[in-house]
């Protein structure tokens, strides 16, 4: 691989943690990665880890050579869906089961039923297998990629490593500028997580940006090119049909999907049905050869609150359901993309209809944004909707950064977007009762109650920022064991007071409730001794 500027990426463990591996039984050489948080109590807490070898101090990172291939990979034996239907627990399924703390048979069954997907192109051996499905932890995707205006290969590789460091489960390369093929090659060869694309973007570049010049042959060849490189899943806007385009005419924001608008322009120019729709069977055959997963695009998603849940959006969703059945008949894995901009009271309906019309294929949503009024804060407006839709059953959330609607995200924006969406995903998992979700909350809450500040930092999603905020006012090392922070100070800390009550109870052989009553009685006597006065004179 060649690049104009050699990429430089962030490496080394996350603060308070180390990289550990568990050997995978039955797959020689395979090791399942975890982020181990070392607690001051002498215990440890292992977390799901997406950062690849970049947080392993013993790993040799050579971006030009790329990451090593994973052990146990078997090529040319069909798709994960076909093998799951045949009753086989693949090496990827076994890896995922160990990673998720779930039975391997559950992984196989969910894939066989089409309710989960394992994006793992035969030609992308560098990835650590992962699963997207509502029975498992909610995943987060981070979009990166250059534009015609800005960015470089080096910057995009750095963003990929940075996003996975903070928890991105997949990456989408949405490059639309120069060197699309080369940028994607660098990302694929160095990505420990699945990589998705939108092939229509590169196809459009090949016809100099004129949608009317697109053909099925140009698109097909672009898809094959990307399959050969190792792209794991592809967004295909095959549900944008000619007859649906007029349904968007009265919308406030029309068609906001880039892929959707490209296909709508082609349909109107030729007054013919979309070549993605009419050639879908052939597309399935190509995907099946490489085990590429469909991410059926919502090209008519609402781009404003006013357009949410309208006729155009749901007409396309019904068509995506039809295409899901066709893809599965070819043994191809499928997930469904969703909105967009949706007010909170309309969010759950999207999940209900997607599951009904699309045979419970994993739902993958962009937010949704719960309001349109906060440019520069859309990582927050969308995380609100993302948490609600995750609780309702969405399997993967596509992050939104503070730069949404404003510009191309930089490194800081990528981290802010990932963290916001890890919060939303985890909140959704807690609400839907994911079996392992609350363990981390309990560990952090216990550390907080016991004033184990360093443990609180290490268990958090962003240890660096948590420590930075604490140290702005209490930077000294003894403050890391103090029983207060700068918010309440030493006398008004509710947790310190609660601990005092418990200490009182232990000292006097009482339970906490008795201790509270005894302490209140003491204060009552003290009040009487001061003449039942609410206000006492100031001490001289």
UniProtKB/Swiss-Prot annotation:
Question: Can you say what this protein is called?
Answer: Phosphomethylpyrimidine synthase
**What cofactor does this protein call for?**
[4Fe-4S] cluster
Which sites bind Zn(2+)? Answer: 341, 405
Which gene is transcribed and translated to give this protein? thiC
Source taxon at top rank: Bacteria
Annotated metabolic or biological route of this protein: Cofactor biosynthesis; thiamine diphosphate biosynthesis
Cellular component per GO? cytosol
Q: How is the cofactor bound?
A: Binds 1 [4Fe-4S] cluster per subunit. The cluster is coordinated with 3 cysteines and an exchangeable S-adenosyl-L-methionine.
What is catalysed by this protein? Answer: 5-amino-1-(5-phospho-beta-D-ribosyl)imidazole + S-adenosyl-L-methionine = 4-amino-2-methyl-5-(phosphooxymethyl)pyrimidine + CO + 5'-deoxyadenosine + formate + L-methionine + 3 H(+)
Q: Which family does it belong to?
A: Belongs to the ThiC family.
What InterPro entries does UniProt report for this protein, alphabetically?
ThiC, ThiC-associated_dom, ThiC/Bza_core_dom, ThiC/BzaA/B
Summarize the protein's role: Catalyzes the synthesis of the hydroxymethylpyrimidine phosphate (HMP-P) moiety of thiamine from aminoimidazole ribotide (AIR) in a radical S-adenosyl-L-methionine (SAM)-dependent reaction.
In short, the EC number is 4.1.99.17
């Amino acid at each position: 691989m060649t690049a104009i500027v050699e990429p430089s990426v962030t490496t080394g463990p996350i603060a308070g943690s180390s990289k550990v591996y568990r050997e995978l039984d039955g797959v020689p050489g395979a090791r399942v990665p975890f982020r181990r948080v070392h607690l001051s109590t002498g215990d440890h807490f292992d977390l799901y880890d997406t950062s690849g070898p970049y947080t392993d101090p013993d790993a040799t990172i050579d971006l030009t050579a790329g990451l090593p291939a994973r052990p146990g990979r078997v090529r040319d034996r069909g798709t994960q869906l076909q093998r799951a239907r045949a009753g086989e627990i693949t090496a990827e399924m076994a890896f995922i089961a160990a990673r998720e703390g779930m039975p391997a048979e559950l992984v196989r069954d969910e894939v066989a039923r089409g309710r989960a997907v394992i994006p793992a192109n035969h030609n992308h051996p560098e990835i650590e297998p992962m699963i997207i499905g509502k029975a498992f932890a909610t995943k987060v995707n981070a979009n990166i990629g250059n534009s015609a205006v800005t960015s470089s290969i080096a910057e995009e590789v750095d963003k990929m490593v940075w996003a996975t460091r903070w928890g991105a489960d997949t990456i989408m390369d949405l490059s639309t500028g120069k060197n699309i093929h080369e940028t994607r090659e660098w990302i694929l060869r160095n990505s420990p997580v699945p990589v998705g694309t939108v092939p229509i973007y590169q196809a459009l570049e090949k016809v100099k940006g004129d949608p009317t010049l697109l053909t099925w042959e140009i698109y097909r060849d672009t898809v094959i090119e990307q399959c050969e490189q190792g792209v794991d899943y592809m967004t295909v806007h095959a549900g944008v049909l000619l007859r649906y385009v007029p349904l968007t005419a009265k919308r406030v924001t029309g068609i906001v999907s880039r892929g959707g608008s490209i296909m709508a322009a082609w349909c109107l120019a030729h007054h013919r049905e979309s070549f993605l729709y009419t050639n879908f069977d052939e597309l399935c055959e190509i995907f099946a050869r490489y085990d590429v997963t469909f991410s059926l695009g919502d090209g008519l998603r609402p781009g404003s609150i006013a357009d949410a849940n309208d006729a155009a959006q749901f007409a396309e969703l019904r068509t995506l359901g039809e295409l899901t059945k066709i893809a599965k008949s070819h043994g191809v894995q499928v997930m469904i993309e969703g909105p967009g901009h949706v007010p909170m009271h309309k969010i759950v309906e999207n999940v209900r209809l997607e599951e009904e019309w699309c045979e419970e294929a994993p739902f993958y949503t962009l937010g949704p944004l719960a309001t349109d009024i906060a440019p520069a804060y859309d990582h927050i407006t969308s995380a609100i909707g993302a948490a609600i839709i995750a609780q309702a059953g969405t399997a993967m959330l596509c992050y939104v950064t503070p730069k949404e609607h404003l510009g191309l995200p930089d490194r800081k924006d990528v981290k802010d977007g990932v963290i916001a969406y890890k919060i939303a995903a985890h909140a959704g998992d807690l609400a839907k009762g994911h079996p392992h979700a609350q363990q981390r909350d309990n560990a952090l809450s216990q550390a907080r109650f016991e004033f184990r500040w360093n443990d609180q930092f290490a268990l958090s999603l962003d240890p660096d920022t948590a420590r930075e905020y604490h140290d702005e006012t209490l930077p000294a090392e003894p403050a890391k064991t103090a029983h207060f922070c700068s918010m309440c100070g030493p006398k008004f800390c509710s947790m310190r007071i609660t601990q005092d009550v418990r200490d009182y109870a232990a000292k006097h052989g009482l339970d906490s409730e008795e201790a509270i009553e005894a302490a209140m009685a003491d204060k009552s006597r003290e009040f009487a001794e001061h003449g039942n006065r609410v206000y006492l004179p100031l001490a001289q």
